[in-house]
């Protein structure tokens, strides 16, 4: 039994070093208390690369910004992995991991230095204060995969870089050239404006960036070239804004405007709504009827203006004859009567008119065609307007009544003509036609002095019955 215990003890002592070696070679746990409580060292600011030193102003101290800084910084695109060429035997997510761990210099441009994603991000953060004064000249890089590129742009294309399509074949990992565009507002503060550019199939949606040369450093550009690029970029930006604000849904800006032609008279309109309002001229439809006088109108707005006629307010008065009107436009037309101005002259008979409406109605009398006919008495008219008022004669609807004799009329015009011809002439107050120039109203009748009657005499006493004695005595 002692021998068996001795053998067991020997085996335990022999396996103890092996177990110690296994424990020492095991990986440390990611959630260990020591790693959690350990203080994370702050990242060191990288020195400025030599190819960026020429673009920075000298004489000013540089303050490095760390990744955990609270100061916001504008990055031209979301950081992605950069790689010069796909490595053989590496597939899936390994190229991205390999490029992050060991960045290599670009093979196409041996003189251009390469930096990893963290280097570019650290440089952009450290040079954030100089972005408003100088452009960052970046060299050529290659995107690992196309993706949406979000960045905040500056005024007039800004000091950040724009991406354009490369000259190589369309491949997910093909080269994407990055070139700087000088900012027109170098001394102005940065105003972020969110924009999104889509990098799909190696084609970035950037308008007309092919006009700028790719792969040109900022220090190699002359002042004239910078001024040219600044003006051109501002012009491109204004054209882009004008194109977005233009009415793109209605067609191209260079397209001819749509016209709507009336099939009856050939009149042209720029909108279909105006053509619809014009068609009742030919159809004769007047759906808007005045409830006071029964006059019909093609438009509701005309009916609203017509209703002012039936009101008692007439603020616009003629200075020559004292006649008052509801609207100033009617007064202006009335002044043509006193001036004898008749701009609308009939080309058939030479008769002049003060108003265009009366001129059009008169021209229809020369046509000889009366297409609007009454169904009751077969009387024809040139206009449907006259036929509408003629129908009142058959239904005994006469809204205008003479206050003197009580006779009714269909139109107010007929009532005024009746009063002027009959009642004014009977009272001796007939008016002269106002249309004839140089006519004056008749002078008033001379006033006669009042008649004076002689004073009244007292009446004579009536004689009484004669007495016989007195009568005989006189004899």
Curated annotation (Swiss-Prot):
GO MF annotation list: DNA-binding transcription factor activity; DNA-binding transcription repressor activity, RNA polymerase II-specific; RNA polymerase II cis-regulatory region sequence-specific DNA binding; zinc ion binding
Keyword Membrane assigned: no
Pfam families per the UniProt record, alphabetical: zf-C2H2 (PF00096), zf-C2H2_6 (PF13912)
Regions of compositional bias (Pro residues) in chain numbering: 439-466
UniProt keywords, alphabetically: Developmental protein, Differentiation, Disease variant, DNA-binding, Hypogonadotropic hypogonadism, Kallmann syndrome, Metal-binding, Neurogenesis, Nucleus, Repeat, Repressor, Transcription, Transcription regulation, Zinc, Zinc-finger
Tissues expressing this chain: Expressed in brain. Little or no expression in other tissues. Overexpressed specifically in gastric cancers. A 2- to 20-fold increase is found in over 50% of gastric cancer tissues.
Main location: nucleus
Protein location: Nucleus
Any single GO BP term: negative regulation of cell population proliferation
PROSITE patterns referenced in this protein's UniProt entry, alphabetically: ZINC_FINGER_C2H2_1, ZINC_FINGER_C2H2_2
Renumbered zinc finger spans (C2H2-type): 260-282, 288-310, 316-338, 344-366, 372-394, 400-423
Record GO cellular component, one term: cytosol
Further remarks about this protein from its record: Triggers oncogenic activity specifically in gastric tumors through activation of KRAS in the ERK signaling pathway.
Annotated family: Belongs to the krueppel C2H2-type zinc-finger protein family.
Disease linked to the protein: Hypogonadotropic hypogonadism 22 with or without anosmia: A disorder characterized by absent or incomplete sexual maturation by the age of 18 years, in conjunction with low levels of circulating gonadotropins and testosterone and no other abnormalities of the hypothalamic-pituitary axis. In some cases, it is associated with non-reproductive phenotypes, such as anosmia, cleft palate, and sensorineural hearing loss. Anosmia or hyposmia is related to the absence or hypoplasia of the olfactory bulbs and tracts.
Database matches in PANTHER family: ZINC FINGER PROTEIN, ZINC FINGER PROTEIN 771
Role summary: Transcription repressor. Involved in the axonal projection and proper termination of olfactory sensory neurons (OSN). Plays a role in rostro-caudal patterning of the diencephalon and in prethalamic formation. Expression is required in OSN to cell-autonomously regulate OSN axon projections. Regulates non-cell-autonomously the layer formation of the olfactory bulb development and the interneurons. May be required for correct rostral migration of the interneuron progenitors.
Protein name: Fez family zinc finger protein 1
Organism of provenance: Homo sapiens
Phylogenetic classification of the source organism: Eukaryota, Metazoa, Chordata, Craniata, Vertebrata
Gene: FEZF1
